[in-house]
Amino acid sequence: MKEQCVAMLLAGGKGSRLNALTKNLAKPAVPFGGKYRIIDFALSNCANSGIHHVGVLTQYQPLLLNSYIGIGEPWDLDRNDGGVSILSPYAEASEVKWYKGTASAIYENRHFLKELQPEHVLILSGDHIYKMDYGKMLEYHAEKQADATIAVIEVSWAEAGRFGILHTNDKMEITSFEEKPKYPKSNLASMGVYVFKWSVLEDALERDEKNSASSHDFGKDVIPALLEENKRLNAYPFKGYWKDVGTVRSLWEANMDLLGDHPPLDLFERNWRIYSVSPNLPPQFVADLAEIKESLVSEGCTVYGSVTRSVIFQRVAIGRHSAIKRSVVMHDVSIGEYVEIENAIVSAGIRIPDGFCAKPEDGEVLLITEEYVKKHKVV
C-alpha cells in the first residue's frame, strides 16, 4: 500500500512569530537540535515509513531549502522508483501564481499527483517536530475504509485554542472540526497530518478552488466541507512526542526536550533515525578547564567555558570563564570571555563580546540577535 501513497510536504511557511530567525529563510529550514533543520523530521519520517514519492512545496525564501534538500540523498530519496521533487509556485504568461492557502498549494500541483495517480495522498506540514510511522496511519486509514484520516493528539486545554480541534464519537469518527476556536469544546488537536483517498481529495480541491468564499485552507475549508458532505473522516490518535515550534519559546522548549537521561524526544533512537545534510567538520574541542553538563555540542566547536543543559550548533566558539545555561546557540557564533547567557536562543553567525550578560527574569526566553547585542553591549 505504501507504494501507492505519495506524500506532499507543505514547506512554504514564513513563520513570522519566530521573528528574526525566519528573516531570510522559511520556517521549515530553521535549525534545530544542534545539527538538523525542522523539515528533517518530516522527511526522515517518510524515509523510515517506506514512503519514497515526496513532493516538497516551497514558497517563502525557498533558495536555501531547495539547495538543502537537493535530490534527497540524506533521506534515501534519491531513487529511480520515486524520489523527492521540489514544487515551487509556477509562473503563467502574465504572473507568478502564489499559493492562497494550504489547499491551494496542493491544487496548484495537482498535475504532479495526476501523473503518479496514487491511491492515497499523505499531506504533511514541514514545520513540526515529531517521529511518526506513517505506514501505521495508512493501515489504520484502510481498516476504517475512510475517505480521509487526520492524525490527532491531545493538547492541554490552555493551548487548545491555538489548533484545529476535532470532535469524535466512540469509533473515532470525526463529527465536527473547528479551526482555532475561541472556546474549545475538545482538546483533541489536528497535527496537520492527513491521509486522503486521491479521488476524494482531487474532487474536494476542484470544488474548493471554484468557491470564491473559501480561504483555500484544509482546516478552515476542505475538512468542514467534507464533513458537510457526510464523507467518512476518521481521527488517528497519536501518543508520541509532537511539537508545533511556531514561536521562539516553543522552539526553545523543543530543543530543551532533547536533553536529559530520558528525554521526551530521543535523537539517539537507532530504529528511527533523523537524517540531515551534515557538513564535513572536525570533532569538537573541549579545553582542560571547560565543563559540559547535560548538553548537545555539535562538530567544529571549541569550548573553553561552561555549558549546562544547552544545545550548541556547529562551529561555535565559547571563551574562557563564560557560562551558557539552558540555551540554544545556533551555528557560527563566537562567544567571548566572561559571558553569561541563560534561557536564550542565540542567532546564527553573530559575535558576543567579552563581559556580555543576558539573564532574563520570570522564565522569559530571549532571542539574542546582532541588534540585541548592540543594544545591550557592555560599555
UniProtKB/Swiss-Prot annotation:
Keyword line: ATP-binding, Carbohydrate metabolism, Glycogen biosynthesis, Glycogen metabolism, Nucleotide-binding, Nucleotidyltransferase, Transferase
Enumerate the Gene Ontology biological process terms: glycogen biosynthetic process
Q: In which pathway does it act?
A: Glycan biosynthesis; glycogen biosynthesis
The EC code for this enzyme is: 2.7.7.27
Q: Which SUPFAM superfamilies match?
A: Nucleotide-diphospho-sugar transferases, Trimeric LpxA-like enzymes
Give the quaternary structure: Homotetramer.
What NCBIfam families does this protein's entry cite? glgC, PRK05293.1
Q: Which HAMAP family match?
A: GlgC
Q: Which family does it belong to?
A: Belongs to the bacterial/plant glucose-1-phosphate adenylyltransferase family.
Question: What is the protein's given name?
Answer: Glucose-1-phosphate adenylyltransferase
